[in-house]
């Protein structure tokens, strides 16, 4: 069974409050998502493997640690997941970025795949899949399935806010994928929105309706 990590750091919780606030404008919303993603990024990369190398400082030769092997790959679920990429790239500037394009049918709430573009070495990378909202879980499950079909083996799912229904579906369908979130909310309403949630993350990031 996949594990769920909820980040309760005071800075993250403070910023999530203003992400939720309907009076937060597009510019500030975008900045807050970026900031929270960076803060979460420190923790989600905590288990990255290290290897020791020899370097020379201005004073002496010494042994020091660097990240071992291939570095992280980032895979935002379009379009809202794009809002989380820069915050992670700030920490991992060498990361390669793939994209999975999905949209949710407004009637069935089922995800429809329209675009997948990935680095050629996804099987060798730890991939962090980003999407601000884990609501029904359908989009996350579809994205993870698409990545595994293309060779991905080491996957993590990073969201800002999740509903219990979405967490359960991901755990049922992809028990090997750990889930990292800033908050777990109460439930989904009849329209598939997380309650209390933050509304439509994509619309709030890009100023659309």
From Swiss-Prot:
A single BP term in Gene Ontology: UMP salvage
Pfam families to which the protein is assigned, alphabetical: UPRTase (PF14681)
Reaction(s) this enzyme catalyzes, per UniProt: UMP + diphosphate = 5-phospho-alpha-D-ribose 1-diphosphate + uracil
A single MF term (Gene Ontology): GTP binding
Main EC class the enzyme belongs to: transferase
Chain residues that bind uracil: 194, 199-201
Cofactor note: Binds 1 Mg(2+) ion per subunit. The magnesium is bound as Mg-PRPP.
Cofactor requirement: Mg(2+)
Binding-site positions, 5-phospho-alpha-D-ribose 1-diphosphate: 79, 104, 131-139, 200
Family annotation (InterPro entries): PRibTrfase_dom, PRTase-like, Upp_B, UPRTase/APRTase, Ura_phspho_trans
Cited NCBIfam families: PRK00129.1, upp
Family membership noted in the UniProt record: Belongs to the UPRTase family.
Protein name, as recorded: Uracil phosphoribosyltransferase
Organism: Brevibacillus brevis (strain 47 / JCM 6285 / NBRC 100599)
Gene field: upp
């Amino acid at each position: 069974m996949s594990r769920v990590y909820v980040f309760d750091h005071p800075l993250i919780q403070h910023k999530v409050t203003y992400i939720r606030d309907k009076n937060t404008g597009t510019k500030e919303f975008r900045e807050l998502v970026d900031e929270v993603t960076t803060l979460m990024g420190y923790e989600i990369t905590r288990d990255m493997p290290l290897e020791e190398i020899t370097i020379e400082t201005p004073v002496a030769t010494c042994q020091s640690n660097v990240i071992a092997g291939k570095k992280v790959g980032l895979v935002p679920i379009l379009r809202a997941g794009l809002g989380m990429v820069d915050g992670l790239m700030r920490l991992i500037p060498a990361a390669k970025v793939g994209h999975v394009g999905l949209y949710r049918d407004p009637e069935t709430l089922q995800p429809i795949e329209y675009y997948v573009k990935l680095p050629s070495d996804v099987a060798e990378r730890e991939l962090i899949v980003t999407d601000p909202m884990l609501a029904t879980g359908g989009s996350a499950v579809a994205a993870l399935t698409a990545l595994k079909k293309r060779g991905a083996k080491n996957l993590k799912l990073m969201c800002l806010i999740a509903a219990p229904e979405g967490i359960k579906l991901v755990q049922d369908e992809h028990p090997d994928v750990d889930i990292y979130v800033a908050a777990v909310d109460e439930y989904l309403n009849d329209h598939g929105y997380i309650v209390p949630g933050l509304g439509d993350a994509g619309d709030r990031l890009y100023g659309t309706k």
